[in-house]
């Protein structure tokens, strides 16, 4: 298990830090929070939530679709909760407003093991130490 950092937003109602995080950072502005969430995350796990959750979900999907962020796994937990959204995605594909390949950005599941395997596969692929090819040998170009 890793260190969990929560990014909270200061609102006049409802928000309090997640009790399951080791560190909590509170932001005054949504846009700063969203930028830092994406910048310092290896993946997103989307849980059932309200407008703020959906806003972050759509922003991240858009960044992945437009290749602003690459190979960023988005795990959607709560298959039943998100089934209408899943159907809406299929309607957008049928209407031609998004491509079939845009579905690859999301994994819909209820399984913690499946979610962790999906994220682990991505991390192993994208965050490994790779040997660097030597560019110089005795100061000569190769």
Model-derived features: where do they sit?
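Phosphate/pyrophosphate-binding betaalpha-module
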Residues: 1-47, 51-54
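General structural feature for long, well-ordered alpha-helical segments within catalytic domains
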Residues: 33, 53-56, 81, 115
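Short, acidic/small-residue loops that bind anionic groups at enzyme active sites
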Residues: 3-14, 47, 61-87, 100-101
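Short, solvent-exposed amphipathic alpha-helical segments in soluble enzyme
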Residues: 59-65, 90-94, 123-124
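Glycine- and other small-residue-rich loops at beta-strand/loop junctions that grip anionic moieties
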Residues: 26, 49, 77-78, 107
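SAM-dependent methyltransferases
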Residues: 105-106, 110-142
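Short, glycine-/small-residue-rich phosphate/pyrophosphate-handling segment
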Residues: 28, 81-110
């Amino acid at each position: 298990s890793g260190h969990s950092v929560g990014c909270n937003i200061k609102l006049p109602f409802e928000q309090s830090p997640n009790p399951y995080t080791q560190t909590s950072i509170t932001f005054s502005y949504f846009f700063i929070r969203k930028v830092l969430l994406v910048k310092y995350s290896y993946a997103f796990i989307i849980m059932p939530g309200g407008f703020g959750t959906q806003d972050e979900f759509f922003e991240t999907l858009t960044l992945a679709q437009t290749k602003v962020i690459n190979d960023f796994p988005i795990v959607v937990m709560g298959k039943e909760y998100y089934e209408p959204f899943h159907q809406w995605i299929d309607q957008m594909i049928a209407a031609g407003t998004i491509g079939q390949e845009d579905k690859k950005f999301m994994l819909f599941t209820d399984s913690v093991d499946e979610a962790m395997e999906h994220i682990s596969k991505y991390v192993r692929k994208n965050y490994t130490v790779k040997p660097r090819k030597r560019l110089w040998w005795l100061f000569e170009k190769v």
